[in-house]
């Protein structure tokens, strides 16, 4: 059980074990492969869906041990999503502000989510490349696309064909919001 395990590392992190249940453990490793945090993902409908525990004071970035920042890389919201994309990081949540380098941001496909729309607009205005999912993609995220039967290569092709930056990103974002406003 997740709370009990966490309490062995950080005594009394969870004073009560009520509602404790098994979770998928996702390790967050630094560039040297050392674990600095881990995330527990619920298997069912338990809430919260994700619980992230920091063992060291660092930004919650998954995949630092797997990505080559000297090359173009991708950044998405969830660790599981990042596993399906080559040279990809994941940030805890959708705060991409602290990242540096040549990267493309891949937000979840939630066009009606006001917070994600604000983050997309902020990312575009910052000058970063961004993926704006085409209308035919109905799945919420990369993991759901894979679960629906798409191959890793198909997802990568959709990402490549729907990456925008600068004025093109602003124009496409305006269209994307209108198309998905219903």
Regions inferred by a protein language model and the residue ranges of each:
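Replication-associated primase and helicase/ATPase modules
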Residues: 1-17, 27-32, 75, 102-106, ...
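Phosphate-handling DNA/RNA-contact segment within nucleic-acid enzymes
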Residues: 2-103, 107, 115-117
């Amino acid at each position: 059980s997740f709370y009990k395990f966490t309490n062995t590392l950080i005594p009394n992190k969870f004073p009560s074990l009520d509602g404790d249940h098994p979770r998928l453990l996702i390790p967050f490793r630094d560039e040297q492969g050392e674990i600095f945090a881990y995330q527990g993902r619920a298997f069912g409908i338990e809430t919260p869906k994700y619980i992230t525990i920091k063992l060291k004071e660092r930004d919650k970035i998954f995949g630092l041990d797997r990505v080559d920042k000297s090359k173009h890389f991708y950044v998405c919201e969830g660790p599981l999503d990042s596993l399906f994309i080559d040279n990809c990081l994941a940030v805890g949540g959708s705060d991409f502000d602290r990242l540096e380098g040549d990267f493309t941001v891949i937000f979840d496909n939630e066009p009606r989510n006001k917070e994600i729309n604000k983050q997309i607009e902020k990312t575009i205005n910052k000058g970063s490349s961004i993926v704006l999912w085409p209308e035919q993609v109905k799945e919420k995220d990369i993991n759901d696309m894979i679960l629906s039967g798409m191959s890793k290569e198909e997802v990568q092709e959709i990402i490549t064909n729907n990456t925008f930056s600068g004025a093109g990103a602003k124009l496409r974002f305006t269209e994307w919001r209108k198309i998905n406003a219903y």
